[in-house]
Amino acid sequence: MSEKFVKYPHHLKYESQDLKHVKLGFTTREGGYSLYPESSFNMARYVDDNPENITKHQEMLADAIGFVRAQWVFPIQTHENRVMEISQSHRGTNIDTLTDDMYGIDGIYTYEPDTLLTMCYADCVPVYFYSEKHHYVGLAHAGWRGTYGQIVSEMLKQIDFDYNDLKIVIGPSTSTTYEINDDIKAKFETLPINVKDYIETRGENRHGIDLKRANALLLNHYGVPFDNIYITDYATSEDLSLFFSYRVEKGQTGRMLAFIGQK
């Protein structure tokens, strides 16, 4: 399958023939005003960066994708599996300054137009949900904790239409070089999918995990057809000229922004 994330200045845009009203994408580290290193495009206010830089980057992205900043929504992620429906009243939350509003939310969805769902990433898996037919978009943040917590299942529980009408995009995130230990592997063995399909033992207390595939397997287990799931080849830990990587850069790095909305 050919790569559907197409590179533009400062972001990757997902392009598919079935998209008419939905826009989704993922920012890169290229260009911008942040120092991760110099001239990078950090999108997170919670890292050591000048807040004015993030505002400039937001404005640049807003101009590129056609959603003004006042239409954006940004929850405070905590690597859990809480999901929240977004209404028009939530627009603008945590865009200019971070607050306690929407704290501990790692999955969001809406049926509202002109509302941009956003979250920050630097290795964790962005899982995009959309249905043009039902005017629905959603976004989940799935690191190993969110994947183990089955946040994709929590997202699906909120959907009251046929999963055949649902499309999933699994975006840029860490590659299979990401490793977990025996204790974490044991947690994944309790999930309703076969660990042999996404975990590879590489040595004593070392197991490579494919978090993208794990989320795809979970989605399929709960009823989403594999034909409706797209997985990008882009890997944050493999291209530090294009992406930030929390693990590779040992936490001293910026964040990319995943976004999805409908007009």
From Swiss-Prot:
This enzyme's EC code(s): 2.4.2.1, 3.5.4.4, 2.4.2.28
CDD domains linked: YfiH (cd16833)
Chemical reaction(s) catalysed: adenosine + phosphate = alpha-D-ribose 1-phosphate + adenine; S-methyl-5'-thioadenosine + phosphate = 5-(methylsulfanyl)-alpha-D-ribose 1-phosphate + adenine; inosine + phosphate = alpha-D-ribose 1-phosphate + hypoxanthine; adenosine + H2O + H(+) = inosine + NH4(+)
Binding sites annotated in the UniProt record for Zn(2+): 79, 124, 141
Cofactor(s) needed: Cu(2+); Zn(2+)
Disulphide linkage map: none
Signal peptide: none
Annotated keywords: Copper, Hydrolase, Metal-binding, Oxidoreductase, Transferase, Zinc
Pfam families, A to Z: Cu-oxidase_4
Protein's recorded name: Purine nucleoside phosphorylase SH1728
